[in-house]
Amino acid sequence: MIAKVVYPRYAVIRLRGIPTTPRDIAATLDLLRLRRKFTMTVVVGSPDVLGMIEKANDWITWGEIDANTLAEVLKRRGRLVGDRPLTLEHLQRWGWRSFEEVALAFVAGEIDRLSCGRKVPAREGQRAPCIPYLKPFFRLHPPRGGLNSLKLHFSVGGDLGYRGPLINDLIRRML
C-alpha cells in the first residue's frame, strides 16, 4: 500500500493591491483565489502550489497555520455561498462537531481541502470530506497596529514573503 504524503498547510494573505500588478502575477493570484487586498486562503503546500506562491512572492505573505488560528478564522470570518456566515449548525449538518474539529482535521492532513463548491454526499454516520458551500477565501481586516513595509520581505524587516508560524500572529491581528 502506498503511503499518503501529507504536505504542510499554509495560510496565504494578499497584502498588496491590484493597480500595478503584472498580468502573469495577477493570473497566479487569481488561481490562489487572492483577488483583493487583505484576503486569505488556506492551501496545501504541494510543489505546484509552492511554485505559485514563489511566483507571487512580492504581493503576498504566507506561513504555516495552526489549528487554533484556523478554527478562529472559520468561526469569525468563514462565509457560505450567498454571503451567509458559517455556523456550527451548518457544520453539524455535514457531520462535524465543532470548528476546532474541522481545523484539526485539516492541519493534521485528514482532509485535503476546507471548502467544496457544492453539496457532497456524506455517508450515514460519517462526516463530509470538506465543508460544502464554504467560500474558498476569507476577507480580513487590515492588521491592528499596521504593517511595517510592503516593499521589504519579512526576513529584512518588512511584511512580504515567508514568515513561518508567525503568520498566526498576523492573522489574529487581522480578525
Swiss-Prot record:
GO terms for cellular component: cytosolic large ribosomal subunit. GO terms for molecular function: RNA binding; structural constituent of ribosome. It comes from the Archaea. GO terms for biological process: maturation of LSU-rRNA from tricistronic rRNA transcript (SSU-rRNA, 5.8S rRNA, LSU-rRNA); translation. Keywords: Ribonucleoprotein, Ribosomal protein. Pfam families: Ribosomal_L30 (PF00327). Part of the 50S ribosomal subunit. Belongs to the universal ribosomal protein uL30 family. This is Large ribosomal subunit protein uL30. It comes from Pyrobaculum neutrophilum (strain DSM 2338 / JCM 9278 / NBRC 100436 / V24Sta).
